[in-house]
Regions:
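N-terminal charged segments
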Residues: 1-80
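A conserved beta-strand-loop-helix scaffold within acyl/acetyltransferase catalytic domains
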Residues: 132-142, 146-176
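A short, internal acetyl-CoA/4′-phosphopantetheine-binding micro-motif in the GNAT/acyltransferase core
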Residues: 47-51, 175-182
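Conserved catalytic-core motifs of GNAT/GCN5-like acyltransferases
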Residues: 85-97, 226-243
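Conserved acetyl-CoA-binding loop-helix of GNAT-fold acetyltransferases
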Residues: 55-60, 183-199, 217-222
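Conserved active-site alpha-helix within GNAT-family acetyltransferase domains
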Residues: 78-84, 188, 211-229
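Conserved beta-strand-loop-alpha-helix junction that forms the acyl-donor binding cleft
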Residues: 72-77, 179, 197, 206-217, ...
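Short amphipathic alpha-helix that is part of the acyltransferase structural core
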Residues: 3-14, 94, 98-131
Length: 243
């Protein structure tokens, strides 16, 4: 796995995937300028500076209100801007698909998820904690899921979808299974279904997992994903104003 230095002038877009997304295909979901951007706070909590220059880091800090938190995810070491504090630092892995995944995709009972499913999606994400997931995160890309029956209001048992998009790549994310749906291979099948959709568009699927989540990494490796790089993750906060 590569670990580019912080001054690598020819950095791959996947090394700063949040920036590549917010300054590219997902610009419409962003706030900021050419130095730093963040997702709309109702969509996601990720943000990124263009680089580690003082100007870009200052612009990133300016996007964060007192008492607010953002997530930064990138391959290079994370520089904490003046005015912000790191309340969490962790490592993950970035994985890319290396083979077609259509044969692994689950199809029975799979349905498209949208605004009408948003409350159930948020509830499932809060229960299983697949990563940052907010009320409008599902608008970042297509999501699919399986419910526990055909009746109206049947429990959402599993879901997966698309998060960051950059030229040539789309991230598989939001993969989670309700405890009542475990043992059915939903995480595997839904991940493959989303990845297959991405591949059919001519793009390469990628994803992120916590470095300590060995079970998830093994699942994705069994689907043909390989580790491209380790990623650094930081939760940054601007302390609330005194008084």
């Amino acid at each position: 796995m590569r670990r580019p230095g912080p001054h690598n002038a020819r950095m791959h877009p996947l090394d700063r995937p949040v920036w590549a997304s917010l300054s590219g295909p997902q610009l419409r979901l962003s706030h900021g300028d050419d130095l730093a951007r963040r997702f709309d706070p109702q969509v996601n909590v990720f943000a990124s500076a263009r680089d580690d220059s003082p100007q870009a880091l200052a612009a990133l800090a300016a996007l964060v209100a007192p008492g607010e938190r953002i997530f930064v995810l990138q391959v290079p070491p994370i520089a904490v801007p003046d005015g912000l504090v790191a309340v969490k630092l962790a490592q993950g892995v970035q994985m890319v698909a290396t083979r077609p995944l259509g044969g692994e995709a689950v199809s029975e009972g799979v349905r498209e998820l949208g605004d009408d499913d948003a409350a159930d999606m948020l509830q499932l994400a809060q229960l299983t904690e697949p990563g940052p997931f907010l009320a409008r995160t599902h608008r970042m890309g297509g999501f699919v899921g399986v419910r526990g029956g055909d009746a109206a209001g049947a429990r959402l048992l599993g879901m997966a979808g698309e998060r960051m998009r950059l030229p040539g790549y789309t991230e598989v994310s939001g993969v989670c299974t309700h405890p009542d749906g475990r043992g059915r291979g939903l995480a595997r099948g839904l991940s493959a279904a989303v990845a297959d959709r991405i591949q059919r568009r001519g793009e390469q699927p990628f994803l992120h997992a916590w470095k300590t989540n060995v079970a998830a990494i093994r699942l994705y490796e069994s689907l043909g994903f390989v580790c491209r790089a380790e990623v650094q993750v930081a939760v940054l906060e601007r302390p609330a104003a005194a008084g």
